[in-house]
């Protein structure tokens, strides 16, 4: 479930989709320096997609 993540994980964005007029939430947390773990979830807490990304500032 998406909402059972650690406390440092937070909603960083949300997307209004045309699919059933639902809302998707993007959660992000920093695992290491500049290394982020993102999760895309539905309003019901179902994880649709997750990925790691290194952010270069």
From Swiss-Prot:
Tissue: Mesophyll protoplasts.
Keywords (A to Z) from UniProt: Nucleus
Residues spanned by motif Nuclear localization signal: 6-10
Compartments reported by the entry: Nucleus
Location, primary (coarse class): nucleus
GO CC, one annotated term: nucleus
Lineage: superkingdom: Eukaryota
Reported function: Stress response. May play a role in the reentering of protoplasts into the cell cycle.
Protein name: Stress response protein
Organism ancestry: Eukaryota, Viridiplantae, Streptophyta, Embryophyta, Tracheophyta
């Amino acid at each position: 479930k998406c909402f059972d993540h650690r406390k440092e994980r937070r909603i960083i964005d949300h997307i209004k989709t045309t699919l059933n007029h639902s809302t998707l939430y993007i959660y992000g947390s920093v695992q290491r320096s500049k290394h982020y773990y993102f999760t895309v979830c539905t309003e019901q807490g179902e994880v649709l997609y997750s990925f790691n990304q290194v952010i270069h500032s």
